Amino acid sequence: MSYISTAGLLKQQDFPDSFKFYFKLHQNKNSIEEISVLKDLVRPRLKITIVTETWSPEINGVANSLLQLCKGLQKLGHRIQLIRPIQKNICTDFQAEQECLVWAKSIPKYADMQFGMPQYVKVSKAIERFTPDVVHIVTEGPLGLTALYAAQAHQIPVSSGFHSTFHDFSRFFDLALLVKPIESYLRWFHNHTVLTCVPSQTTLNQLQAFGVTCPLVEVGRGVDTTRFHP
């Protein structure tokens, strides 16, 4: 690891003189621990609004991945607002700084799947109150679309996540006739965000071929090394 000067990092942010004196006094060019501490001190802390129509303890890959993402962001000092539908069961593994709950509607014939109702005024007021640095939309359903419009109205950058090939498996949910409109909508949705996160290089390539032209960034799925290790 290359050495990062203490002076350079301290200039990035206003610290009390006592902090600066301590770090200068204990400066050690071979101290990886010191570099780590300094990086943590100067890392920007963001206010992030996360919008999703699925959330733990629902059992699916998107809900589980999102839970781990929120835990990781909060551990790094970021402040999280969660906008999601009301659920029958409560998640006990994570507590957001703020939550905005909207009414939920089950998908016909699939009671375990639901989407959030487009309560624009409620969502807009929640975003305005939290004043996030960015709004990250995980799902592209009615709630996600509502959040997109609300964030744009407040001139807040919007990022999105592409987690499920809904336009593919919709063929198996009696929605075959809607595949083309769904494809067009998903392409339009993600092209109206400043960034779309994807789980793999394969998905990134597929979205580019699909016509998504906004910047795409691979955010791989991690492994809990406490539970899973050699």
Question: Could you tell me what each predicted segment is?
Answer:
Residues 84, 100-103, 183-230:
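Donor nucleotide-sugar binding/catalytic pocket of nucleotide-sugar-dependent glycosyltransferases
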Residues 88, 142-143, 202-204:
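Alpha-helix capping/helix-boundary segments
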Residues 108-137, 142-149, 153, 180, ...:
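An amphipathic, basic-hydrophobic alpha-helix
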Residues 83, 137-138, 161:
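Structural motif
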Residues 157-159, 167-188, 225:
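Nucleotide-sugar donor phosphate/pyrophosphate-binding loop at the beta->alpha transition
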Residues 2-101:
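N-terminal subdomain of nucleotide-sugar transferases
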Residues 97-103, 153-155, 175-179, 214-216:
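Short, hinge-like loop/turn segments at secondary-structure boundaries
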Residues 48, 134, 149-169, 197, ...:
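Active-site proximal beta-strand in glycosyltransferases
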